[in-house]
Amino acid sequence: MATKGTVSGVIANMVTLVVDGPVAQNEICYISTGGDKLMAEVIKVVGSHVYVQVFESTRGLKVGAEAEFTGHMLEVTLGPGMLSKNYDGLQNDLDKMDGVFLKRGQYTYPLDKERVWHFVPLVKVGDEVGPSAWLGQVDENFQPLKIMVPFQLTGTYEVKSIVPEGDYTIEDTVVVLTDREGKDIPVNMIQKWPVKKAMTNYKEKPRPYKLLETGVRVIDTVNPIVEGGTGFIPGPFGTGKTVLQHAISKQAEADIVIIAACGERANEVVEIFTEFPELVDPHTGRKLMERTIIIANTSNMPVAAREASVYTAMTISEYYRAMGLKVLLMADSTSRWAQALREMSNRMEELPGPDAFPMDISAIISNFYGRAGYVHLNNGETGSITFIGTVSPAGGNLKEPVTENTKKVARCFYALEQERADRKRYPAVNPIDSYSKYLEYPEFEEYIAKRINGEWIGKVNEIKTRLLRGKEIAEQINILGDDGVPVEYHVIFWKSELIDFVILQQDAFDEVDSVTPMERQEEILNMVIDICHTEFKFDTFIEVMDYFKKMINLCKQMNYAKYKSEQYEDFKKQLQELVAERSV
């Protein structure tokens, strides 16, 4: 019999219940109020008193209201039909809800039960299968999706029967499995999985090493991220976090893109909803939305659902990874998720940590980032989740707890800087503070040596050193004035400016410059390094400035020209002539 409870206290969206039976941590219950049933999650159990966080507004909720427990945790429903959907944090289909505002206590089923899918069997009667083994395949938006053995099963099973190739709905039984005791288990296309629990349906999780091409030079060339890697983008407001995230999600080499807009401003989420259906996928020429799922929880939605939305997005990503797909997960912004954790922690009167965040914030963040990664599946295939989260530190302070704790677990750090944004140097990633720890991985070095060449990492480190030297000289020029430093110093400074303008800066709104393939990035890097190695002869700093401005202008024109086009080759020739003019 289901456990029941009555409300004994309400503090905003945290409700205390007195229960008459056993209750599990993270179990879901429904509280009845004025004809609505409000969904809530157990966050703390003390004897017969249970603390729950309600995923809706608790306005009008009275002491004495009744609650009924479901006996399961917060689960997502997984199956064909999720691509190109817009969900909220609890996986309600937003397109099925009408009205300007979401009504309280309104929940919708995330999948389409009527739609028919063309099922192709991948196993035959008598085969032995284990949890998450591939049983069949359906095509959704030209993406082959696998129908798998339910994840929660353990041990091995025998395929007793499988339907022939044909059209079925998600609720039709497509396979019947038999366990060791001879019990039949019918399997359809739907899976359920609790969001707070990581899926471990793979053989091993090696260190990731394959470069994930994004087309953004400051990432691919200077601080690369890998398939199955983790990265985060902190930065104050207006520095271009969202534009950079959109650029990555449009251009990255991923099969599935999942965007979790948790706690973002409503107008930014509307921007995603209106922009993404219009975008064309550069890899396939089809609409980008066909392989995208958006999970939206704006700032004005209840705090608890904001926390759930990040976990929902990660669980959906793990489901696609189990099919052997490359998934890109973007969370915008993890700070709002951490604030939701802080709010609940404060309401439960727990001991506060730094900035009143919970004491275990670092464990929560590292457990979450740990769910991403590159895996070898049980059948020998590989899948990956590349996770990039943005952090919006209050006042742009990168020393606050969320940024500090994320720094410990994320391998790539792209620090967006207000000063660069103010100077209109976009993307405003500070090349000196940012880093990618993947450059130190021997596996990555081997991969890059095969993919591009063995000197690549040495060249990347050289441009970082030159940028640092250029910054030091810029400070000296500021203090001593242009005449106060030798002409050679001006040359070093302008060579670092050349790297900044040609490699780091990129126009996200230009058709050509917004996406730079690796082949072109290699040519740009070699060209800039060759110029930096060239000795030039100048008499005054004004000559240096005028000469390098011409050079930067030619290089920028090359970036805007189609690769290997007549125009591109013409600018390249002009650049070579300009370099020859002053070289010693």
Which sequence ranges carry the predicted segments?
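N-terminal accessory targeting/assembly segments
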Residues: M1-K103
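Short histidine-centered loop motifs in beta-beta connectors
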Residues: V54, R59, F119-E128, V159-D167
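P-loop NTPase nucleotide-binding/switch module
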Residues: M97-E140, L145-Q152, T169-G229, L244-A247, ...
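P-loop NTPase catalytic core
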Residues: T221-V222, G228-I552, K564
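Short, surface-exposed secondary-structure boundary micro-motifs
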Residues: D20, G34, H72-M73, Q91, ...
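C-terminal amphipathic alpha-helical interaction region
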Residues: D539-V584
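Short, compositionally biased
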Residues: I43-H49, P80-Q91, F142-G166, D184-M199
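Short beta-alpha junctions and helix-cap segments that line functional grooves
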Residues: E27, M39-E41, V54, T70-M73, ...
